[in-house]
């Protein structure tokens, strides 16, 4: 006994001529999640040095993410690097509309797809077995929570005070100057930094900023059996 169903809803007409991503608009698929496509972590080799204010100087050919920064944060080694999908040389969300969304893309959908159920049963020597299974084959969600993102909120500082970096930092002999970075691209999380739960500089998408803008890498898989 097996059942499978699927559905998808598209807006055919809506009074939103600007097609703002934060609202409904004609042609929008209901439940779409917009965000950036994660590339990797920044390496020290992506920069040529630092400015006096601590911001990093991007090497030629590396797309700048300075427009995404919420002060006093600056992108640097160990931080999330997003893909420059529109080839402009700078990462942004355009005007936050369907027609001008910069490097944003649909990274998932929050509605359940491929809902299924099946039943198994039988008997043997007077023993009856009856099993029912139910699940969703595909569903995504963008959620901001401390369990997903350690040290994302300022209140998490006390919990993770001894885990401020999952990357190695090299210091001078007097321990006063950072001389280099060893970035592990296999790390689960980027350089930890508090206060990322607030709204960033990009319009039309869910909350999250700096390393935790809505993005493909940290999209939550809500499928289940």
Region spans (language model):
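Mature extracellular/passenger domains of Gram-negative fimbrial/pilin and adhesin proteins
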Residues: 197, 201-209
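Outer-membrane beta-barrel pore domains and translocons
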Residues: 3-7, 123, 134-136
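Extracellular loop and loop/strand-boundary signature of outer-membrane beta-barrel proteins
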Residues: 103-106, 215-219
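Residues that define the transmembrane beta-barrel architecture of outer-membrane proteins
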Residues: 112-116, 221-225
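Short glycine/proline-rich turn/loop motifs
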Residues: 95-101, 207-214
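Conserved small-residue
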Residues: 1-108, 141, 148-152, 156-199
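Repeated loop/turn-to-beta-strand initiation elements of outer-membrane beta-barrel proteins
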Residues: 126-130
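Membrane-embedded beta-strand positions in outer-membrane beta-barrel channels/transporters
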Residues: 1, 117-119
